[in-house]
Amino acid sequence: MSITGIKGFNDLLPAESGLWQFIEQTARQVFARYGFNEIRVPIVEKTELFCRSIGDTTDIVEKEMYTFMDKGGSSLTLRPEGTASVMRALIEHKLYALDSINKLYYMGPMFRHERPQKGRYRQFHQIGAEVTGAADPLIDAQVLLMVSRLFQEFGLTEPRLQINSLGCPACRPAYRQALVAFLAERQEALCEDCRRRQGTNPLRALDCKVPGCIEATQGAPAMVEHLCNECDQHFSMVQNYLTAAEVPFSLNPRMVRGLDYYTRTTFELVTGLLGAQSAVAAGGRYDGLVEQLGGPAVPGIGFALGVERVALLLGDRSFEKTPDLFIAVMGDAARTAGFRLMAALQDQGFWVETDCEGKSLKSQMRRADKLKSRYSIVLGDTELVAGSGTLKRMADGNQQPVHLEAATIAAAITGGGQT
């Protein structure tokens, strides 16, 4: 019996890799315009990192983390998200001392033990960005602007930006009290998890996906109605900056996100095209996280997008790459000459294929068609003696004579086949 992959851990096949490369390359280009540098962190961290950052009472920590004991007896976890690892690296390497503001981005796999479904997998991939060192609402607006522009570069206009404010430690207690009182009157309608968390983390009820909890929390108090003056001004300025930059957004007072470290501004890009998995990107401010992990009081804000979900939205768009030239050869001398020509053209940046199986000319041309090569050329004794051949444009059959020199063929391919 053959060995198959693990449920929820998917292979990325060659037919899909062009789309993923487009997503990653586009993100890198946009991040560069906004002054971000890449950071790469391990996929495995000490379990304590995620318990302290994400929160002990979140679904991620309670139910979804891949945690194991290593041979030294340490509890380790496959990272379920990227922000905690980036902040750990920021503290460990004292990046905050090198520059007052750090702009970092990352790409890579994350792991959560969830029920696999469309847009949700046990190994999934995120592209994220973090800014630390500035608490000004202008930074919030810059991050939101960047996210908006990134999706424009993807060619996606359907995802809608929703924002909320979760306040700060000064104003959240009053809101928590109001929310607990509201939930206490609806105990019977809440799921077991939401009832259990009322004493530790009642905000999780607003993020619960159980239908009964969604219905029971309709009309719940909104955090934006309980903001202190400072948080209210901060949130107002974020909205003013977004309006000034003509970034469309809407308020979603129910948005609390699934991680406990968020403060003040939170946001999601949502779509109705992915069923229950409506968020394709999300993030927010986390002003106390670095200090909570043992570092100095460094404010921060960031976001992450789901690569699989963006790929689903891009759908059937073709990012297939095809060879520039297929060199068909007849005879040993032609095979050697074809190999030399192929190497010279590859050195100039062209994708060139040739026969490696000793097949007939007819079979070689069938392979050129199958590969969807843009051009083909046949090399045999006649062509070698003449020092020239016929370059064929495969799309329409147009043929042009060319000298068997890499520079001449390169110019013909680049110029559309005209020599």
UniProtKB/Swiss-Prot annotation:
Q: Does the keyword Ribonucleoprotein apply?
A: no
Its primary localisation, in coarse terms, equals cytoplasm
Which Cys pairs are S-S linked? none
Q: What EC number(s) are associated with this protein in UniProt? A: 6.1.1.21
User: Does the record's keyword annotation contain ATP-binding?
Assistant: yes
- Tell me the domain of life: Bacteria
Q: Record's Gene Ontology CC terms?
A: cytoplasm
One Pfam family of this chain: HGTP_anticodon
Q: Name one GO molecular function term.
A: histidine-tRNA ligase activity
Q: Where in the cell is it found?
A: Cytoplasm
What keywords sit in the KW lines?
Answer: Aminoacyl-tRNA synthetase, ATP-binding, Cytoplasm, Ligase, Nucleotide-binding, Protein biosynthesis
What InterPro entries does the record tag this protein with?
aa-tRNA-synth_II (IPR006195), aa-tRNA-synth_II/BPL/LPL (IPR045864), Anticodon-bd (IPR004154), Anticodon-bd_dom_sf (IPR036621), His-tRNA-ligase (IPR015807), HisRS-like_core (IPR041715), HisRS/HisZ (IPR004516), HisRS_anticodon (IPR033656)
Q: Which GO terms describe its biological process?
A: histidyl-tRNA aminoacylation
What the record says about family reads: Belongs to the class-II aminoacyl-tRNA synthetase family.
Q: What is this protein called?
A: Histidine--tRNA ligase
The species this protein was found in: Trichlorobacter lovleyi (strain ATCC BAA-1151 / DSM 17278 / SZ)
